A protein has these predicted regions:
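Residue(s) in the substrate-gating loop at a strand-loop-helix junction
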Residues: 142
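Conserved glycine-rich Rossmann-like NAD(P)H-binding loop of the short-chain dehydrogenase/reductase
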Residues: 28-45
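A glycine-rich helix->loop->beta "capping" turn
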Residues: 53-56, 76-87, 95, 106, ...
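Substrate-binding pocket helix/loop in short-chain dehydrogenase/reductase
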Residues: 98-99, 106-111
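A short, exposed helix-loop element centered on a Lys and neighboring polar residues
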Residues: 122-123
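The beta1-alpha1 cofactor-binding region of Rossmann-like NAD(H)/NADP(H)-dependent oxidoreductases
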Residues: 40-41, 61-73, 104
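Conserved glycine-rich cofactor-binding loop
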Residues: 7, 14-16
């Protein structure tokens, strides 16, 4: 197992790509923190699948667009696991719509989650990783970064 003993945090891990990443990390030996914004039940299902592989897992609800929430989440990871070795910035939202019809609140929500959320989580994790002199950060982006939607 390539990641035996490593402690990972995956944002947006209750479904989709985040869920698949969390399960893949666990399959390689990592203990995983499953972050979610909405469905605690879905997050707990992912954690149960991880535990069924013989790995440790727990769930943390956090709105990563909030610096305080992101920092508290990473602090919880370190408190529970003693360290953070891997951060996967996966959480993201879409508010697709034509520019002329898009509400400013929708634009702001996308930027604060998809951009500021990555900043918040990375900043919170990197202070521990620097003290450990080790750590990996992976930030996932959407294909929309290459090919935009109509709008």
């Amino acid at each position: 197992m390539k990641l035996e003993g490593k402690k990972a945090l995956v944002t947006g891990a209750s479904r989709g790509i985040g869920r698949a990443i969390a399960l893949a990390l666990a399959a390689e030996g990592a203990d995983v923190v499953v972050n979610y914004a909405g469905s605690e039940a879905a997050a707990k299902e992912v954690a149960a699948e991880i535990e069924a592989m013989g790995r440790k897992a727990f769930v943390v609800q956090a709105d990563i667009s909030s610096n305080e929430a992101a920092t508290a989440m990473v602090d919880t990871v370190v408190k529970e696991f003693g360290r953070i070795d891997i951060l996967v910035n996966n959480a993201g939202i879409t508010r697709d719509g034509l520019l002329m019809r898009m509400k400013e609140e929708d634009w702001d929500a996308v930027l604060t989650t998809n951009l500021k959320g990555v900043f918040n989580c990375t900043k919170a994790a990197v202070k521990y990783m620097m003290k450990q002199k080790a750590g990996k950060i992976v930030s996932i982006s959407s294909v929309v970064g290459l090919m935009g939607n109509a709008g």
